Amino acid sequence: MYQNFVTKHDTAIQTSRFSVTGNVIPAAPTGNIPVINGGSITAERAVVNLYANMNVSTSSDGSFIVAMKVDTSPTDPNCVISAGVNLSFAGTSYPIVGIVRFESASEQPTSIAGSEVEHYPIEMSVGSGGVCSARDCATVDIHPRTSGNNVFVGVICSSAKWTSGRVIGTIATTQVIHEYQVLQPLK
């Protein structure tokens, strides 16, 4: 009997690395959720250093996504997407993070309707003062369901109560082309 073993996140040495600075304005899950990218996330791996200002009204709820375009060339439609997140939010923002998948005809979408986003929950921990950390993976369909669309995956950050202030941290995503290893049985 053989076992399949799926590894958790391991940030690759060769990555598309860039910093995002500016303002983040979360949108309600029923509205258009902003997609944050550097305009050049087209690699199988991306590390995003996020230094942004959270511009929200008092006790605003909403979400934002940090995304990358996936490589759709593998013949197997299912691929493991690995995510590592370390973020610090100002004030009393307590976010929930997860892996998301969505399609867009655009090469670099700036927003996506909340109803068009598929959510994959991941294991995370939240500390006091709006600090969150997550490291997990999910199996995602990487082929477009609508011909001509681009497939994007990323990390969504949602909260029922955002507080205005700084967002600082790193989000790393990796598309794992070879998703599992076959282990020999124990003797």
UniProtKB/Swiss-Prot annotation:
Task: Output a single Gene Ontology CC term carried by this record.
Answer: viral capsid
* InterPro entries, A to Z: Capsid/spike_ssDNA_virus (IPR016184), Spike_G (IPR003515), Viral_coat (IPR029053)
* Keyword Ribosomal protein carried by entry: no
Q: Which domain of life is it from?
A: Viruses
Q: What functional role does this protein have?
A: Attaches the circulating virion to the bacterial lipopolysaccharides which serve as receptor for the virus. Determines the phage host-range. Probably triggers with protein H the injection of the phage DNA into the host cytoplasm upon conformational changes induced by the interaction with host lipopolysaccharides.
The entry assigns this protein to a family as follows: Belongs to the microvirus G protein family.
Any one of the GO BP annotations: symbiont-mediated perturbation of host process
Read off the Gene3D superfamilies from this record: 2.60.120.20
Lineage, broadest ranks: Viruses, Monodnaviria, Sangervirae, Phixviricota, Malgrandaviricetes
Name of this chain's protein: Major spike protein G
Q: How does it assemble?
A: The virion is composed of 60 copies each of the F, G, and J proteins, and 12 copies of the H protein. There are 12 spikes which are each composed of 5 G and one H proteins.
UniProt keyword terms in alphabetical order: Capsid protein, Host-virus interaction, Viral attachment to host cell, Viral genome ejection through host cell envelope, Viral penetration into host cytoplasm, Virion, Virus entry into host cell
Q: Where in the cell is it found?
A: Virion
